UniProtKB/Swiss-Prot annotation:
It comes from Rattus norvegicus. This is Kelch domain-containing protein 8B. The lineage of its organism: Eukaryota, Metazoa, Chordata, Craniata, Vertebrata. It is found in: Cytoplasm; Midbody. GO terms for cellular component: cellularization cleavage furrow; cytoplasm; cytosol; intercellular bridge; midbody. It holds the Pfam family Kelch_1.
Amino acid sequence: MAAGGGQAFAWQVFPPMPTCRVYGTVAHQDGHLLVLGGCGRAGLPLDTAETLDMASHTWLALAPLPTARAGAAAVVLGKQVLVVGGVDEVQSPVAAVEAFLADEGRWERRATLPQAAMGVATVERDGMVYALGGMGPDTAPQAQVLVYESRRDRWLSLPSMPTPCYGASTFLHGNKIYVLGGRQGKLPVTAFEAFDLETRTWTRHPSLPSRRAFAGCAMAEGSVFSLGGLQQPGPHNFYSRPHFVNTVEMFDLEHGSWTKLPRSLRMRDKRADFVVGSLGGNIVAIGGLGNQPCPLASVESFSLARRRWEALPAMPTARCSCSSLQAGPRLFVIGGVAQGPSQAVEALCLRDGV
């Protein structure tokens, strides 16, 4: 059921993390929010692992990661949390894969990636972990697609992505993994491709209409949304440098085409490097960076039923570069940058679901 209006949403503020961080890796498992690694105040990757008990609202320290890292991917596999790739203390991508065994409170090393990579996108389906793309030590974007078999602790290669990239957005819909955007070096990628898990083949869909860095992406009700970001200079605009935009582009999976929504349906605020998600039939955009000198606290939602944007309650702690995670009726916004790495943990909630 669609939730309507700003009154349908509220912020839930949790105790701050013991360790402030940005680019942390987050996972939700059995009523616990795990925050792993990331970069601290010194700007170096952390091996710190902490968990928030959602029932008691208390933080506990976990055994440190064997490999300090930031910007890693995480996948929950039953009672384990698998941490994949990332970047180490010398700013080099890592190949290390490690699993946290929740029942035993310890880490185990797993089969490493064939190539070190940061910005890997991961998806879990039926106990199999799919890893797509990444950036290697030579800074070149990767097209590799891997599947992890946990029973045999091994990575197998699958057909490569048509467009190499890192930091892409991925969505699992039916038997397909959709891969949108990402980057090649400093350049944003406009490719939109889908991998069929049954036939193990790739399909190229029409590319994003506009080239934007640090855009937000979400999927809801059979459509994929690409929001905001930094518009890149090009032959079709008069800007000489990147600029914040409030663009809204929507891809209809059934009809296979992009629609660039008119000016009247653009976001209320121009923003980039923000959190985006789907709650109660609404696409929500949270925080980020805009034309102001500090991070944004503003929050807005696009109702898929009413086809309009509405202001929501502001984020208690204005931030950008946050980690995020959706768990039921909550969209968690974790850490990030305020006036430095943040300890804040807050969740935008549907009032009826909390």
